[in-house]
Amino acid sequence: MFDIKRKTIEWGGKTLTLETGRMARQADGAVLATYGETMVLATAVFAKSPKPGQDFFPLTVNYQEKFYAAGKIPGSFPRREGAPSQKETLTSRLIDRPIRPLFVKGFKNEVQVICTVLAHDLENDPDIVAMVAASAALVLSGVPFMGPIAAARVGYVNGEYVLNPTLDEMKESAMDLVVAGTAEAVMMVESEIKELTEEQVLGGVTFAHKGMQPVIDAIIELAEHSAKEPFDFQPDDTDEIAAKVKDLIGGDLRAAYQITGKSERHAAIGAAKEKAMTAFAKSEANPEGYDANKLGGVFKEIEADIVRRSILETGKRIDGRTVDQVRPILGEVGVLPRAHGSALFTRGETQALCVTTLGTGDDEQLIDALEGKYFEKFMLHYNFPPFSVGETGRMGSPGRREVGHGKLAWRALRPMLPSYEEFPYTIRIVSEIFESNGSSSMATVCGSSLALMDAGVPLKKPVSGIAMGLILEKDGFAVLSDILGDEDHLGDMDFKVAGTADGITSLQMDIKIAGITEEIMKKALEQAKGGRDHILAEMNKAMTAPRAELGEFAPKIETIKIPVDKIREVIGSGGKVIREIVEKTGAKIDIGEDGTIKIAAAEQTKIDAAKEWIKSIASEPEVGQIYTGKVVKIVDFGAFVNFFGAKDGLVHVSQISNERVAKVSDVLTEGQQVKVKLLGFDDRGKTRLSMKVVDQETGEDLSKSNEKAEEPADA
């Protein structure tokens, strides 16, 4: 029934198996990849003709994690997988980015890649396995794909690079570096780094590229036995129409790209495009004209060629800057009066309002992952409204791009955050992109760093970020610092670097062409270092260090420790005691399993009240000490006084006063505040208190005064 083909190799100390022919046989390409005991099924299906009027390449990548893969049932109400999690969205992007540039130019048939995690051994992250499986499925499918690619994760433990470290090994690693590439070149880099140097990071990229070569060979060997016939696709010959369009509007485009303002430049480019469409597009007046979509593609190619040649020949860019020049920067802090921390970061025509909010343990985000449930204490949310680029558009839940940009900034900042023990707050940052003309994710890094310091978060060091670009031709290359949106679209590489003055904390790279050498990457990292240092200097004009105190409206948190055996008493039966403390003091209280209690409130008095209440429950009163209490019950033989948290004690009628008390209610009333001394405990453990040995006005211990009075005089 099955024509199963397998290829097995040893890779990174574990066995990688690629299998086809058993599962999902109706897909154009299907590969089951197994690494350790982690299994991912990748399928690739493509339409055999493009949709009419299609003017872009419709590639969709979906990565999905099934809870059964880890022997779990989803924790959601319907108990089934629902909307993609952040991890699924990010991994979908991770797979998409290196494969998209490798489809044959001009291919516009719909392609869908679906990667399904079938088993997770809780040691090997499925993301790398999914990237390998997706590449293999595409190669087998016959789609015009210039792969294969492979991917690898690199850790950095004790000064050594580690290929495909386990989840446990990653906890000790100073680097989480994911690299994807072909046999010849790196195509994509994604990372979170604990302040390493440019040389260490570049070494990790090189190590990963070398380490993935056996996987590329394995995919090729599998394809030799299992691949379908290549799909017959011939790109359109556009040389003739390209020459005509360039003759007509080449000069207009060159003039348009001399305009430094984005809006004015785009208007001039639009006019040039309209001129070409009017002259050459098929219409009733021009039935022999060219297809509008084809013309649009030709226009983009001419546009890119003009800009790229101009930069290489003159060293000047679209807005007049040199290749290593950063746009003017302005950082402002404290821009929102009630926010815990806020900053407005503007770089040229890119602007981000970043707002920090501090919360308590109640505000942590519960993540239900295959590896298990955990709480996230640091969140960064990036919003990109359509008005930021002067357009109308969809508003609603964040798209993949917003999730990805937010995660990039999150990775850049996280290594510089204080430990939870040092700063026991949940931190949420929101970045609102108000203007965008390139590098809004790096503006988010810079603005968020300022907003954290404005909130009083003890950031280890300020973090800045910069987006780099590349123009690569046969006769030379140019690395561009702080790229514009147009330079991003027309260039060959998007290279984002974030870090402190002492090292890199995050690197993301997407390469659109083959042939990016180690020399070019080294040059880009060196140039980025100069740009980051310049940006940090500009940020320092707004703020150089975190504020010494939290903002007026931020919650204050204090931590105390109680014996573990006292936790039950603090919580009370059914939570009765802790609810009463919260209700009456107005403080938020979080009790850890180890007896650590975090008390949070906007006002210090509320924290103090809750703290004293908890201490009174968790500690024991001392014999001989004087306490202020309240009469809670009067009986014939005395009065019960609440004197130490929830603890009551008996003041016997004989201990109320030095004078005879005939009737207790004649001397005391319920609710009356009194001062008592703890005499000790009777045989049954009941508390014995005394009022008569305490001065009810001053709280002085009269028994000690009497002892002093009875002491003999010195001889």
Swiss-Prot record:
Residues 624-692 form the S1 motif domain. It is found in: Cytoplasm. SUPFAM superfamilies: Eukaryotic type KH-domain (KH-domain type I), Nucleic acid-binding proteins, Polynucleotide phosphorylase/guanosine pentaphosphate synthase (PNPase/GPSI), domain 3, Ribonuclease PH domain 2-like, Ribosomal protein S5 domain 2-like. It catalyses: RNA(n+1) + phosphate = RNA(n) + a ribonucleoside 5'-diphosphate. Its main location: cytoplasm. Residues 701-715 have a biased composition (Basic and acidic residues). InterPro entries: ExoRNase_PH_dom1, ExoRNase_PH_dom2, ExoRNase_PH_dom2_sf, KH_dom, KH_dom_type_1, KH_dom_type_1_sf, NA-bd_OB-fold, PNPase. It comes from the Bacteria. The keyword Cytoplasm applies. GO terms for biological process: mRNA catabolic process; RNA processing. Residues 555-614 form the KH domain. The keyword Nucleotidyltransferase applies. CDD domains: KH-I_PNPase (cd02393), RNase_PH_PNPase_1 (cd11363), RNase_PH_PNPase_2 (cd11364), S1_PNPase (cd04472). Residues 692-715 are annotated as: Disordered. One of its GO terms (cellular component) is cytosol. Its cofactor is Mg(2+). This is Polyribonucleotide nucleotidyltransferase. It comes from Phenylobacterium zucineum (strain HLK1). The lineage of its organism: Bacteria, Pseudomonadati, Pseudomonadota, Alphaproteobacteria, Caulobacterales. The gene is pnp.
